[in-house]
Regions:
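Short, small-residue-biased leader/transition segments that mark boundaries at the very start
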Residues: 1-5
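Glycine-rich beta-alpha loop elements in corrinoid/cobalamin-binding modules
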Residues: 6-102
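Short, solvent-exposed loop/turn segments at secondary-structure junctions
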Residues: 11-15, 40-42, 63-66, 104-107, ...
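A short helix->loop->beta-strand "cap" motif at the edges of active sites that frequently abuts
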Residues: 28-33, 55, 199-201, 226, ...
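Catalytic cores of alpha/beta
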Residues: 45-51, 216-220, 278-294
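Radical SAM [4Fe-4S] cluster-binding motif and immediate context
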Residues: 109-263, 275
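Flexible glycine/acidic-rich beta-alpha junction loops that bind and position SAM and/or redox cofactors
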Residues: 183-184, 234, 240-245, 275-283, ...
Length: 311
């Protein structure tokens, strides 16, 4: 009996383990069909299959629809063959590797809601997405590749937010890359969670602090302590570094916003730095650290520059 499995999405932090699992599982189950996907294999799928003869195919780019198409293909064999399926690189029975064209970006409102059975997610952080893509072009970031910025329908978003609120989920972490890049979208979501606050659920957002306008700031000021928390990417305060990585951040504005939100006393702020960026030596990084630390965020997170496929 043949089985179709989709292994864990491949990221820089797990690729080595996924590759080893693929090798080992093929030894004990040689008839199994293995597909992998994710950012670490999407951009060089042919090389991945050359390196991993145990893997039958790579899903490149957005995988929701591609994975469904693969399941239909292996289940009934009546769907179009792999040669007509977009968004994949696959190995034919002859061993030849074929790379198909990329799939068009998805309508985000058609992505299924996966949290209907909350028992499966007990004691886990809920990750939720209302937009995909990013309007910026930071050269170290995978999100800058996807220029097609899309938003989930707001009526659908409200319905799903209410589901989380009704179930008293402890935390919902939005994975939107720059949540406040569209003012009306951000305000609608923030107003909704404020008006329907259950006194328990916390919502985490990644925002560009220098894009927060007066209306947004005044709304944030009125929120229950702990209703939202904000993650703000600074990465560096070195102007040469900021220019080199094509980042548009204005640190003076970021600092002003962070201090003002601090004065509200109701929002946990989480600021990020990256070590290893261009033009950033030990002394320069120390200054970036001091600049951010002086803002007194509740959390300062330090990441290290990683070479990401596709970036």
């Amino acid at each position: 009996r043949q089985m179709c499995i989709r292994d864990r999405s491949c990221y820089i932090w797990n690729l080595t383990y996924v590759e080893e699992i693929c090798r080992e599982i093929k030894k004990v189950m040689p008839q199994i069909i293995i597909w992998i996907g994710g950012p670490e294999v999407s951009y060089d799928g042919v090389k991945v299959l050359e390196r991993l003869p145990e893997v039958d195919g790579v899903m490149k780019g957005e995988g929701e629809q591609t994975f469904c198409d693969l399941l239909h293909f292996y289940q009934d064999k009546t769907a179009d063959g792999l040669q007509n399926m977009k968004g994949i690189v696959y190995r034919e029975k002859t061993g030849q590797i074929v790379e198909n064209e990329w799939r068009k970006t998805m309508d985000l409102s058609k992505v299924p809601f996966v949290y209907e059975n909350m028992e499966l997610f007990e004691h886990k952080i809920i990750y939720y997405e209302t937009s995909r893509g990013c309007p910026f072009s930071c050269s170290y970031c995978l999100s800058s590749i996807d220029k097609c910025l899309r938003f989930r329908d707001l009526e659908l978003v409200k319905k799903e937010l209410q589901f989380f609120i009704d179930h008293k989920v402890p935390q919902v972490k939005f994975v939107d890359r720059t949540f406040n890049c569209k003012h009306d979208h951000a305000m609608t979501v923030w107003r909704y969670i404020k008006e329907h606050d259950n006194g328990i659920t916390n919502f985490h957002f990644e925002v560009a602090a220098d894009l927060l306008n007066e209306e947004e700031m005044e709304l944030i000021k009125t929120m229950r302590p702990g209703l939202i928390q904000l993650e703000i990417g600074v990465q560096s305060t070195n102007l040469d570094t900021i220019r080199e990585i094509h980042r548009t951040m204005k640190f003076e504005q970021v600092a002003e916003v962070v201090r003002r939100i601090n004065s509200y006393g109701n929002v946990h702020q989480h600021l990020d730095l990256i070590a290893g960026l261009p033009y950033e030596d030990y002394e320069s990084f120390g200054k970036s650290f001091d600049d951010v630390y002086a803002l007194e965020p509740e959390q300062l997170q330090l990441g290290f520059l990683k070479v990401l496929k596709g970036s």
